[in-house]
Amino acid sequence: SSGSKDSTQGGSKTSSKGDNKLVVWTLTNDLVDYGKRFQEQTGVKVDTVVIEPADYPTKVQTALLAGETEPDIIVGEPQMLDDFYDAGFFANLDDFGAQDYKDKIVDYVWEVGQDSDGIQRAISYQITPAGFYYRRDIAKEVFGTDDPDEVGKLFSSYSTILDTAKKLKDKGYRIFSSDAELSYFSGDSAWVVDGKLNVDQARYDYMDLCVDLYKNDYTAYATQWSTPWYQAMAGEVPILSADIQSGADDSVNVWDSTQFEEATKDAQKTSVFAFGLPAWGVLTMRDHVGDTSGKWGVCAGPTYGFGGGTYIGISSNSKRQDTAWDFVKFCTLNEDTSDWWIDYSQGDTVSYLPALEKHKDDENEIYGGEKLYQFWLEQAKGIDYSKVTRYDKQIGDAWSQAISAIKTGEKSKEDAVNAFYDTVQSTFPEIEIDR
């Protein structure tokens, strides 16, 4: 409990009272807003530094290994956390009584914040399960319904997705901007089981689906985060070619909106049916839907997936750990803060269960009045975190490279899969591989 903490750490308690300050190192702007609010409510001066995700692990490592006592608050995305835990960078939150709050946070988020010994090291303020954001008007026209449960059936397996894509193309639409929209639904099994590489049939089914979507022109060939990808949220987009997407044809610059418009002014146009994104996609879509606002719905995909999320903890070197714990609680375990964030962010999905419960009947007008908090909570309940391993990002990237090599004709399926095995073997020699 916090009582025993005070007596064991008398020194740090006194010094933290002395300077009434916190230094936060984070990856996104969210904590800038949280920091300002914490400062307003507590009088603690919060100095928040936002660092590029690519540079973040190195910066934290350099500071903490050098014994720096600031930052006080550090964060991590899920794929960074295991290394941070192993290095001892995060203080033990159970010393502050974190387990008292176990039932207040969505299960998978609580588990992500634990190290391999089950000690709580970090907590996130948001849940990030994935779903498909689809156009209700197109669903009605092509499939006769825009009901999320019914539309979910069109995405319920890799083979039904291919069938859905064909029907949409026959009506002049494209199912996705590109096959990258499937990346959060790339499989439902662990990549590594008992030290062995595990490539199950579903991984191959996913691979085949990506290749088929690409080869049959079922997508608009618009890369995620590019100009046409954002445009597709607001309405019609030019249909690009596979060569433009792969970069083999560089006549169209998809990263510069002015050049893009000029280069594609005579191109055939289409509307894109769906985007595959985690719950934070609500915010991305909000800023880009324009005139299609109200015409969207959200439904489940073929597997339970999640992506991203900012997990907050205390630096083990911090001399202000009690104040830092107050900040962690303020961001993640506080109903007032959760209510404020739901409103302020215009729809980010918090992890604090009492707030999700309270907002479960909130209707989101951009999505035709759908009750999104209820939907995301259901999706989050389906996430089995025991299937997540520290190897996922690199093995998943290597599998994606194999898929790209097959769909662009650079390699045969057999050669691409063998190259995948080679990559895994050289990157992680400790993993046993049966070819």
Residue ranges and their predicted role:
Residues 1-83, 87, 99-102, 150, ...:
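Conserved N-terminal structural module of periplasmic/extracytoplasmic solute-binding proteins
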Residues 19-22, 42-46, 68-72, 119-120, ...:
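Loop/turn elements at helix/coil->beta-strand transitions in domains of secreted/extracellular proteins
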Residues 27-29, 76-80, 179-181, 275-285:
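Beta->alpha turn/N-cap motifs
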Residues 32, 205-320, 326:
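Extracytoplasmic/periplasmic substrate-binding proteins
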Residues 76-133, 140, 162, 293-300, ...:
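Hinge/lid segment of periplasmic solute-binding proteins
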Residues 96-100, 114-183, 191-227, 316-322, ...:
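Helix-loop-helix "hinge/cap" segment bordering the ligand-binding cleft or interdomain interface
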Residues 121-122, 168-179, 334-347, 426-434:
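Bilobed periplasmic-binding protein-like "clamshell/Venus-flytrap" ligand-binding domains
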Residues 282-283, 305-306, 310-393, 435:
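Mature extracytoplasmic/periplasmic domains
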